[in-house]
Swiss-Prot record:
Its EC number is 3.4.21.-. It comes from Holotrichia diomphalia (Korean black chafer). The clip domain consists of 35-55 residues which are 'knitted' together usually by 3 conserved disulfide bonds forming a clip-like compact structure. Cleavage of PPAF2 is Ca(2+)-independent. Inhibited by heparin. This is Phenoloxidase-activating factor 3. Residues 97-350 form the Peptidase S1 domain. Serine endopeptidase which, by cleaving prophenoloxidase activating factor PPAF2, is required for the activation of the prophenoloxidase cascade probably following the recognition of pathogen-derived products. Proteolytically cleaved. Belongs to the peptidase S1 family. CLIP subfamily. InterPro entries: CLIP (IPR022700), CLIP_sf (IPR038565), Peptidase_S1_PA (IPR009003), Peptidase_S1_PA_chymotrypsin (IPR043504), Peptidase_S1A (IPR001314), Trypsin_dom (IPR001254), TRYPSIN_HIS (IPR018114), TRYPSIN_SER (IPR033116). It is found in: Secreted.
């Protein structure tokens, strides 16, 4: 039993509660705070197994107070099904190997564009995001927290910003995608500990709840969230995509793609410290290649990997946060590490 409790990652003694307080579970269910040994659904799990990472994450999120084993005792051990099953996310057709070029039509169908409406009424696409379910887009908090604009719409299924309809080929060999889906916003939730200062950007993550579910098709699909232990080794490549700045102009018309290597975090911390910036373990450093990086228009977009070759599943590992001048050699860009924010994500999505 005690081994199972240690696995939960909460190092404190069990305490008794004289009053049964009302509480809300991570799934939004109204329940009662009970000592864990009095909550049958949790206690049976602890004494028989205690080794499921998802349930352990849910249990930690169910604590009524930090520092004790009093839990919000609801009817389930797992987060709600607002997020897709891992068999239904991160899927796309098989496309050619990357090289820092235009994507193919339909490639990376989880890519989102955020429309920013300024106080003057002017509208533009200034940030990106990632569809993670039929109702939620994951992005950077700095993309949605602003006094000069409001994020008013999300576009999904886009490829070429110049075209009224995206098509490739010609004649009888031409095929086209459906029109992009422009969806309004029901609510935006930025991380409560988001901070942007002269020392850096911290907890740079936000969730956008769409006004309606997306219509899934070949061109609009959610990407998988990472596993809690998902870490790409230093030197291996991850991917970025978006409509960000290129060498010749401020923004690309077509969705771009690029491979970037993960760089050593301690070395990245030292490098940025010389410029009075703080890098912490909830961040990923990647890139630093001359002329190749994620740029301003890609803010909030994904840094993502794949589980294998061919028709692999893709998962989001980071969110584009900030960096030095785009494409500066030796200066990797900074990404929010998604696996360190899984509990927060799961607590803030609902069906």
């Amino acid at each position: 039993m005690w081994l199972s409790l240690v696995i939960l990652g909460v190092a404190s003694a069990i305490v008794n509660v004289s009053t049964q307080e009302s509480c809300t579970t991570p799934n939004g269910e109204t329940a009662t705070c009970l000592p864990i040994e009095s909550c049958k659904i949790f206690w049976d799990y602890v004494v028989t197994s205690g080794a499921d990472p998802e349930i352990n994450s849910f249990l930690r999120a169910s604590l009524c107070r930090q520092g004790n084993y009093v839990v919000c005792c609801g009817s389930t051990l797992k987060f709600n099904s607002a997020l897709p099953d891992r068999t239904e996310c991160g899927l796309q057709d098989d496309f050619k190997v990357l090289g820092g070029e235009d994507t193919d039509l339909g490639e990376y169908p989880w890519m989102a564009l955020l429309q920013q409406t300024k106080t003057s009424g002017a509208k533009s696409f200034g940030c990106g995001g990632s569809l993670i379910s039929d109702r939620y887009v994951l992005t950077a908090a700095h993309c949605v927290v602003s006094s000069s604009y409001t994020v008013t719409m999300v576009r999904l299924g886009e490829w070429d910003l110049r075209a009224t309809q995206d098509c490739v080929g010609s004649g009888s060999y031409q095929y086209c995608s459906p029109p992009p889906q422009d969806i309004g916003i029901e609510s935006i939730t930025s991380h409560p500990n988001y901070e942007k200062s002269s020392r850096g950007v911290f907890n740079d993550i936000a969730l956008i709840r769409l006004a309606r579910p997306v219509n899934r098709n070949k061109y609009v699909q959610p990407i998988c969230l990472p596993l809690p232990t998902e870490r790409t080794p230093v030197g291996e490549n991850l991917l970025v995509a978006g409509w960000g700045a290129t060498e010749t102009k401020a923004q690309s018309d077509k969705k771009q793609k690029l491979k970037l290597p993960v760089t050593d975090l301690p070395a990245c911390k030292t490098l940025y410290a010389k410029h009075n910036k703080i890098i912490n373990d909830k961040m990923i450093c990647a890139g630093g290649l001359k002329g190749k990086d994620s740029c301003k228009g890609d803010s909030g977009g994904p840094l993502f990997g794949q589980t294998g070759a061919g028709n692999a599943q893709f998962y989001i590992e980071g969110i584009v946060s900030y960096g030095a001048i785009c494409g500066t050699e030796g200066f990797p860009a900074i990404y929010t590490r998604v696996s360190d924010h899984l509990d927060w994500i799961k607590q803030n999505v609902r069906v």
